[in-house]
Amino acid sequence: MTTKFVFDLLAPDDILHPFNHVKLIIIRPIEVEHIIIATTMPAV
């Protein structure tokens, strides 16, 4: 479910354009990493 949330956040139309999230990961790796950390780390 967390992975689905991350993908929706990166590319809401991921089903229609499956390469959108790949392009975002290549262009904005830092933001993606921060999103993944924020969604996987427990809230303090």
Swiss-Prot record:
<dbReference type="InterPro" id="IPR009314">
    <property type="entry name" value="Corona_NS1"/>
</dbReference>
<comment type="similarity">
    <text>Belongs to the coronaviruses ns4.9 protein family.</text>
</comment>
<dbReference type="Pfam" id="PF06145">
    <property type="entry name" value="Corona_NS1"/>
</dbReference>
<protein>
    <recommendedName>
        <fullName>Non-structural protein of 4.9 kDa</fullName>
    </recommendedName>
</protein>
